[in-house]
Design a protein with these regions (language model features):
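Residue-level signal for inorganic ion chemistry
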Residues: 27, 80, 119, 179, ...
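N-terminal catalytic cores of NTP/NDP-binding nucleotidyl/phosphoryl-transfer enzymes
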Residues: 7-72
Length: 311
């Protein structure tokens, strides 16, 4: 997969099949669009091209209300490569680019560089200044320029449209298993291990505190989760607490994970991936630390019983 991170060095292709979108989450709806692009391009022996934007446009256009995002760009590229896209263009999105009109974007980037025989987009995608580039706009433009436009219908499950907005809502409410189903991959994110207060070690459950690499990363609702971690290429299961540790009357939000089979306690500064498999319970204020320890032992047993399902 070829990846271009500037519009100044993207190639000129004789013909291609193109899709355009933000693709935050690369969820099952996005994947249907991408699979259609790949299969169509392969059927005519041309390259498949995906044009996307980084950072998320709403991070530039809505500075006072930054949208929590579902994935770091590295995760997006990992999924796109697994779907066999040939060319990915990551257009740097800034205020100047946000003022480019839809027609100018199509003329100067899409048509000029990729000469599309077909453009395939999702039903709700808009692009260009003031979101002028609607599916209807693109269809009419395609008729002018002599290429076809396919607008794919939404993917639904149990009468619910799979969308980034709905998936964000699920994660914010702690429904991580359902969110992963709609994403088509297990929700999680790359993080850096930071030094904590050592509270978990005192309780007999040493933990690694972590913060997401992506500063605008969406995190699940407070609570205890069964997780799978990846450290230096190794998969480890564990349990994770997101919250404020109310038993100790603390107020700062902390993310900490206890790995069941971690052989080294010295992972400070390491990058790890934490995948949220299932939510176990709410965060609870216990009357004393001993009550918390008793509950943590029950939580661990609960998580261990779930491991076989994910092996």
């Amino acid at each position: 997969m070829e990846v271009y991170k500037s519009i100044n060095n993207i190639p000129l292709l004789p013909e291609s099949v193109v899709t355009i979108g933000t693709f935050d989450g690369c969820h099952r709806g996005h994947q249907e669009v991408i699979k259609k692009v790949v299969s169509t391009s392969q059927s005519i022996n041309k390259k498949s091209v995906l044009i996307t934007f980084d950072p998320h446009p709403r991070h530039i256009l809505q500075l006072d209300n930054k949208l929590p995002i579902l994935m770091h760009v590295s995760k997006k590229l990992e999924i796109l490569e697994s779907l066999n896209i040939n060319v990915v263009v990551l257009i740097p999105f800034d205020i100047e680019f946000s003022k480019v009109k839809a027609k100018d974007f199509l003329n100067n980037i899409v048509v000029k560089h990729f000469n599309p025989s077909r453009i395939i987009i999702g039903y709700d995608h808009h692009f260009g200044f003031e979101r002028e580039g609607s599916p209807m706009f693109l269809t009419n433009y395609g008729k002018e320029k002599g290429f076809n436009v396919d607008v794919l219908d939404p993917i639904t499950d149990e009468n619910i449209t799979i969308s980034s907005t709905h998936i964000r809502k699920l994660i914010k409410e702690g429904f991580v298993r359902r969110a992963s189903f709609e994403l088509g991959w297990v929700f999680g994110f790359e993080s850096q291990v930071i030094e904590g207060a050592g509270r978990g070690k005192e309780l007999g459950f040493p933990t690694a505190n972590f913060v997401p690499v992506e500063k605008n990363q969406l995190v699940p609702a407070n609570g205890v989760y069964f997780i799978r971690g990846r450290i230096n290429g190794n998969n480890l299961y564990g349990m994770c607490n997101l919250g404020i540790r109310p038993t100790f009357n603390e107020t700062d939000f902390v993310m900490e994970v206890h790995f069941f089979d971690l052989t080294s306690n010295n992972i400070y500064g390491e990058n790890i991936t934490v995948e949220f498999l299932e939510r176990i319970r709410d965060e609870i204020k216990f009357s004393n630390p001993q009550k918390l320890i008793e509950q943590l032992n029950k939580d661990k047993q609960n998580c261990m019983s779930l491991m076989q399902k994910y092996n």
